[in-house]
């Protein structure tokens, strides 16, 4: 009984989907499906990667974003400065260990 219902539903699906194909013409000019695609030039412009893409920065090395970032890295490499920075802040810890910022 279940097999008959499944076959009936599959047959109806084939009739519904098959009937739509016969209503449309086969020529490309009359087909509305060509509207779903864009030209190769437009797709190339759309898919073009930015010059500052992630892989480019990884291969080249990312630029330092903050002027204090290099000093922060120096302080992090010194365990005493790093510990003091956790308590009183990076700038004050760097000033105490290495002089004025």
UniProtKB/Swiss-Prot annotation:
It is found in: Secreted. Gamma-carboxyglutamate residues are formed by vitamin K dependent carboxylation by GGCX. These residues are essential for the binding of calcium. One of its GO terms (cellular component) is extracellular region. Disulfide bonds join 75-81. Ca(2+) 1 binds at residue 69. Keywords: Biomineralization, Calcium, Cleavage on pair of basic residues, Disulfide bond, Gamma-carboxyglutamic acid, Hormone, Metal-binding, Secreted, Signal. Ca(2+) 2 binds at residues 73, 76. It comes from the Eukaryota. Ca(2+) 3 binds at residues 76, 82. GO terms for biological process: biomineral tissue development; bone development; cellular response to insulin stimulus; glucose homeostasis; negative regulation of bone development; regulation of bone mineralization; regulation of cellular response to insulin stimulus; response to vitamin K. Residues 53-99 form the Gla domain. PROSITE patterns: GLA_1, GLA_2. One of its GO terms (molecular function) is hormone activity. Residues 1-18 form the signal peptide. InterPro entries: GLA-like_dom_SF, GLA_domain, Osteocalcin, Osteocalcin/MGP. Belongs to the osteocalcin/matrix Gla protein family. This is Osteocalcin. The lineage of its organism: Eukaryota, Metazoa, Chordata, Craniata, Vertebrata.
